[in-house]
Structure formats: structure tokens, C-alpha cells
């Protein structure tokens, strides 16, 4: 395609976007046909560069602070105009997509990118509707210009790059950011602000459906197993990361998956493996001279990624949605080796652990977190993406669980037999057996044992799981060391939870000293 230097390529096919990316030297093809790209010095999200415009509709509704940073409306207008003029002077790409699979809750989005590969990424991750914006809703605009360099003194940004959401104008500005995950998570944050007003709980979770129509949700931070565990060849995938839960429905906010690639194997993750083909994007994955991906090579980043459309998954929900969930699973990667592989939660415990969002940063998606693995608390299992006060999401969760009668479980995909460096991590087959037991209903009404310090109820037997693994204390050679580690973890939970204004019943549902 030879056009003027400021040509606009609108709604190109996937094939043409791949060709344009290759013609521009934006990436190369792996032997699977996937487009391989590099994102420069940013190989993860940059939380310190993300802002929300402060204006009347957001002033009192946002939980402002280090996560949701204020940006002045006048500065936004000036920067948008500057970035738009820069982009309009050169070739760029436009696609029209939806964010939200439910008819009542989709956003119509005009996505403009400077690069062909980021447009392809958006086409992988967002929804490509048969008919664009049938309800004629006011359009959102995403302007993503990777080569623009912000000047903090002039633009009011924190660095040379920024992500700024303007709810009043329905605009998302992404400048100087090559890591495409910023675009996906920005629109997730938009829906996370809008959906609660429609009585829909937005969730950082994966979802799948069984043959009988039963739905399972998998909450968890990056690296805890959402994508891997939801990609189950025996079930139909709804989505791997972002969903809404309304009365009678769980729907995908996206139209694709964004899988971590570190140590990816065909044996352990066959669904993901098969999805990485023509039309998919590999971000910061090292390939050899034969164009074969080396998923064990972390020389670029531990946060290597594959973006692919749901159409690449053979067994999926054709409508991109399902009914309300029978099982709600909170995935936590416990570095301390204190938590059991599975616990059965009541409503108050569900609220407590949802608000706590305890896990580890594993191969973190955030810049500046380093390669080290460390424990963290991330409210709603996704604090960086939830603009409203946490209590609003927790109240909606309890309302939905109570209304449908969903069963809730805490599943540890982290360590056992000792903490990180001493014990070992639960292997994927063991965790899959736990998930299968939950989905079969085997744990409903099961006999349990109460673990006092961490205040959790553990089933005495789980089909397919060694019984000695169920009570974590049994897996430690030094029982006294386990008891001390449990007290230390309980202290972390208690300290973290002091910031929440909730009922005494929810406060009492957590660990105790």
C-alpha cells in the first residue's frame, strides 16, 4: 500500500495489518506465523505515568491517590491537541472496536495508533463486532502515539510517556508508550469506573463454562494462574482477564487474551500454545535464527506476552458471555508457604479476601518492581485498575454472591513445605486437580478442618490431590517454623486491613493473632 505520508489506514484486515507492520520494520514473523515485536525500555505497565482527568464527574467519585493520579483538564486538552497534531502529520491506523460483550454495556471505541502492530494488538484484545455501535452510542476515542515524547515541564506528565483517561470527553490518551498492555488496561479502567453505576461488578478475572453451563470465575493478579487455569481443554473459555457480572450474566469486557509467555509449554498450556499463530502478537519474546520462540529466555523481560483473539481458541463461548458463576475462585500466589492449596470461604471471608487481594508479584507486569518476587496486597485482585473506592466493588461482589448463591474458594498457586527459596511451588497438575474438584461440586458441603491463625477452613479430602498437602502445616519439616510464619502472615493481613471501613463481621473474617 503506497499512500501519502499522512495516510490514514482504516479498519484494515488482520492480514494487512501484519503486512504493514512487517513493511515498516515494526517486527518479524515467528515460525508459527505470529508477529514478534519489542517494546523498548518499557516492558510492562508504568503506573506512575497513569492519570485520570479531574473534572466534575470524577472529582468526588474517584479514590484519588498514588494509583489514581489527578491530571488537570486544561493540561489534558493542550497535550491531546499536541499529540493529535503530531500523529496527523504521519501515517497512522484506525480501527473501530467494542469494549464489553453485553449488548447493554458495550463501549464503541475509535482506536487510533501510530503503529500497525499496536492496532493489530487492539484488534486481538478488543471486540471486533459484526456491526459497529448498533445502539448509536457516543464514541470513545483512544489515541495511542508511541513515538511522541512528552516533556514533563511542558505537558504536566511524570516522564516522556503517559496514559491519561478523560471520562468527561470519553478520551484515552496514550503517548510515548510502546508496551501495548497500557491500551488494554486503560479501557479496562474505564469500564471499571462506568459499570458499577449500572449495577454491574467489573472484575479482574478469567471465566470459563462447563458442558452443563456452569460458570467459574478466576480472580488473581498477573502470574497467579488466571490465564493458564481458565484455558482448560475440557471447558469453554469466556475470557482470561476482564469481565462484568450483572444480574443473570457474566460477560467478557474483551475479545482476546493476553497470556504471559515465560516458560510456556505445549504440555502444560496447550490452549495458549495453539493460539500463538498468524494474527497473534508476541511481545518481548526472544526468537532464534530459525524464528523459533524461546519462552525460557527472559533476557528482555520476565513479562513476555502473547496477544491473540478468542477466535484462536477452539473451545470458547461463541457469545463471549455466560450465566452467573457457580464457583468464584480467588487465586493467590503465597510466597510464605502458609496458605493451603484450597480453602472454602463464607460471604464475610469472601469480602475480606477480595478487599485484601493478597498475592505475590511474580514476573511483574509493572515497571520498577524489579525481577524479585515479593508479597503484596492488591485490592480487588487488581488495585491499579479500579478507580472507585474499594468498598463499592466489595459491596457489589457480596450482592452478586448472595443473589446467585455462588460458592467462593481461596486457591494458593504459590509455595508449600516452606516459603520461597525453601519450599516448592504447587505444580500446575495439582492446582488443576483442585480446580476440577471445585467445578465438579465435590467440595460443596465437604468435611473441613479449621486453621486458627489464618482463620480458614480446609477440606479434609480433595479428589486427585494428596491429602498431606491440604493442611500446609503438615508439609513443613519444622512445624514451629510454620507456626511463626503463619503468625507473621496474619500480622501482614491485619495491618493491611486497617485501612478499610467495613462491618465487624468482615473484619473478623480474616487471620487472627
From Swiss-Prot:
It catalyses: oxaloacetate + ATP = phosphoenolpyruvate + ADP + CO2. Its cofactor is Mn(2+). GO terms for cellular component: cytosol. Mn(2+) binds at residues 185, 204, 241. Pathway: Carbohydrate biosynthesis; gluconeogenesis. GO terms for biological process: gluconeogenesis. ATP binds at residues 185, 204, 220-228, 269, 305, 431. InterPro entries: PEP_carboxykinase_ATP, PEP_carboxykinase_C, PEP_carboxykinase_N, PEPCK_ATP_CS. It is found in: Cytoplasm. Involved in the gluconeogenesis. Catalyzes the conversion of oxaloacetate (OAA) to phosphoenolpyruvate (PEP) through direct phosphoryl transfer between the nucleoside triphosphate and OAA. This is Phosphoenolpyruvate carboxykinase (ATP). It comes from Pseudomonas fluorescens (strain Pf0-1). The gene is pckA.
